């Protein structure tokens, strides 16, 4: 609540933090807080004008949780920064009343501290009491650092014995044996790339004679294990191993403040570095060892350290079981009762173009990928086939690319059929809204009529009075477009007033009714 002191002309802002707690700030206090914060921090809440951050802000305005999750978790887009208008993603989400987005941002480290300008602004601007209570009750220590699936998989490659069939190098020390992967360590460290390149094809074991525990701790660090232990007792050994492996960022932070190795920010930095390292390694493989299937007399590919192949319509790629197992489809093929599980170098087929297959590889190796709009529909199909269809997975990324287009590159009919075939609600809503906005151009199209019939046939044992999903969706988006609410409608589904908007709405509803009569359908 805001009030003004009549004697001094000072505006006060009252913020309620509970049933009995109140705190008053003059506008000068708030301005002072903002200036103090700006001086104290060079990275927190600084202006970020990158395209990814602006897309995050826009998604928070709209309440598009799927896009927000994708940008934060797949692309590591920062959330504690502001756009050119000084709005952070959390402020935008709370201001626009999107509770699921607010909850997600808080769980992923968004700051809302009551004694800061951005925190007070977020609380004061919250659209409803539910969001305000969520912000007030939230303690930053409650932040859920949910195991990111990508990082979790990388860690499990070292720690999960069920995935040891993907390993090809063993480090044997006095405390036991550690199973690892040549390709992964070669991608993360130039030392290992050089070391493994000198090993013969039958050499799969290296003896660790000294500091075996410290060596294992460094390996766990490289595999993103958050429980890697770095003891004070062997500082020199850890630093020596780090220097040998050329882990300059690890050495710098360990010497400065080793406790930061377990901080949230450092984990995000290492996750991004791992994605970058594996992305560069994959680019190297594609550039040097991608082979047309009509000429499989391949060049030497010993530096790819592969243990499988992935084959598109036209090309074959050396790949790694450890990464392919991120996909349940390939995991079943490589670990289940199938021929591929018994082959030394199995060939996994993916019946799509090389461009689409390379998008799949990029996603599996890095958890992110750039998808050209003209390929996005095929990517939705391949992601559905491979069961890469969970939140912020490959199907989600491809769907976002399609729905960002004002004018679709593919046929809107193909997009809707793809949505039906792959159970993708985001695409279905996009196609229905597009059809509602362009109804006058589509209503006489024979293919549109056929699509309405298909929608009617999607209801098993359809009765005469059952609704048609596509028609219901189009009617919904028409009412949303023209601002017509259910209580405004007459019994026949139209409005009885004659404002220009309502008149146009009635015309479009009549067009739909005429089409249904023509098709002898009721909905």
Curated annotation (Swiss-Prot):
Keywords: ANK repeat, Cytoplasm, Repeat, Ubl conjugation, Ubl conjugation pathway. One of its GO terms (cellular component) is cytoplasm. Ubiquitinated and targeted for cul3-dependent degradation. ANK repeats lie at residues 85-114. It comes from the Eukaryota. Residues 167-223, 306-373 form the BTB domain. InterPro entries: ABTB1, Ankyrin_rpt, Ankyrin_rpt-contain_sf, BTB/POZ_dom, SKP1/BTB/POZ_sf. GO terms for biological process: proteasome-mediated ubiquitin-dependent protein catabolic process; protein ubiquitination. The keyword Repeat applies. Pathway: Protein modification; protein ubiquitination. The keyword Repeat applies. Its main location: cytoplasm. It is found in: Cytoplasm. Interacts with cul3. Probable substrate-specific adapter of an E3 ubiquitin-protein ligase complex which mediates the ubiquitination and subsequent proteasomal degradation of target proteins. This is BTB/POZ domain-containing protein 3. It comes from Schizosaccharomyces pombe (strain 972 / ATCC 24843) (Fission yeast).
């Amino acid at each position: 609540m805001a009030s003004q002191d009549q004697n001094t002309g000072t505006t006060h802002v009252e913020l309620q933090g509970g049933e009995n707690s109140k705190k008053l700030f003059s506008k000068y206090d708030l301005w002072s807080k903002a200036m103090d914060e700006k001086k104290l921090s060079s990275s927190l809440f600084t202006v970020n004008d990158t395209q990814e951050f602006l897309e995050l802000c826009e998604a928070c305005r709209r309440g598009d949780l799927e896009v927000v999750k994708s940008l934060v978790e797949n692309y590591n887009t920062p959330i504690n920064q502001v756009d050119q208008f000084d709005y952070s993603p959390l402020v935008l989400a709370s201001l626009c009343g999107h509770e699921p987005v607010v909850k997600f941002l808080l769980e992923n480290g968004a700051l809302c501290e009551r004694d800061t300008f951005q925190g007070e602004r977020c609380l004061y601007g919250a659209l409803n009491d539910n969001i305000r209570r969520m912000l007030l009750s939230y303690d930053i220590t409650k932040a859920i650092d949910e195991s990111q699936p990508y990082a979790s998989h990388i860690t499990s490659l070292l720690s999960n014995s069920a995935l040891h069939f993907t390993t090809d190098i063993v480090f044997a020390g006095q405390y036991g044996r550690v199973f690892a992967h040549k390709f992964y360590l070669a991608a993360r460290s130039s030392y290992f790339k050089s070391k493994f390149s000198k090993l013969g094809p039958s050499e799969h074991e290296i003896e660790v004679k000294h500091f075996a525990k410290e060596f294992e701790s460094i390996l766990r660090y490289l595999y993103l294990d958050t429980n890697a232990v770095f003891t004070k007792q062997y500082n020199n050994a850890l630093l020596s191993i780090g220097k040998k492996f050329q882990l300059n960022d690890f050495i710098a932070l360990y010497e400065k403040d080793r406790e930061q190795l377990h901080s949230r920010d450092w984990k995000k930095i290492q996750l991004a570095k791992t994605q970058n390292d594996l992305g560069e390694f994959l680019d190297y493989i594609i550039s040097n060892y991608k082979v047309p299937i009509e000429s499989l007399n391949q060049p030497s590919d010993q530096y790819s350290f592969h243990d499988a192949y992935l084959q598109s319509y036209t090309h074959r790629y050396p790949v790694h079981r450890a990464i392919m197992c991120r996909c349940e489809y390939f995991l079943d093929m490589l670990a289940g009762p199938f021929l591929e599980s018994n082959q030394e170098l199995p060939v996994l087929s993916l019946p799509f173009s090389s461009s689409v297959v390379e998008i799949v590889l990029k996603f599996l190796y890095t958890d992110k990928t750039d998808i050209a709009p003209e390929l996005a529909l095929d990517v939705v199909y391949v992601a559905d086939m491979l069961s890469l269809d969970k939140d912020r997975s490959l199907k989600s990324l491809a769907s976002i690319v399609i729905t960002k287009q004002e004018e679709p590159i593919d046929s809107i009919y193909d997009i809707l059929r793809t949505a039906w075939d792959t159970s993708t609600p985001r695409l279905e809503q996009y196609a229905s809204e597009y059809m509602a906005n362009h109804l006058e151009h589509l209503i006489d199209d024979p293919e549109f009529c056929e699509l309405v019939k298909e929608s009617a046939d999607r209801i098993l044992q359809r009765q005469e009075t059952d609704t048609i999903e596509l028609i219901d969706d189009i009617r919904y988006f028409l009412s949303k477009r023209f601002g017509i609410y259910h209580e405004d409608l007459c019994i026949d589904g139209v409005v009885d007033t004659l404002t220009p908007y309502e008149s146009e709405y009635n015309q479009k509803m009549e067009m739909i009714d005429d089409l249904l009569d023509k098709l002898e359908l009721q909905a």
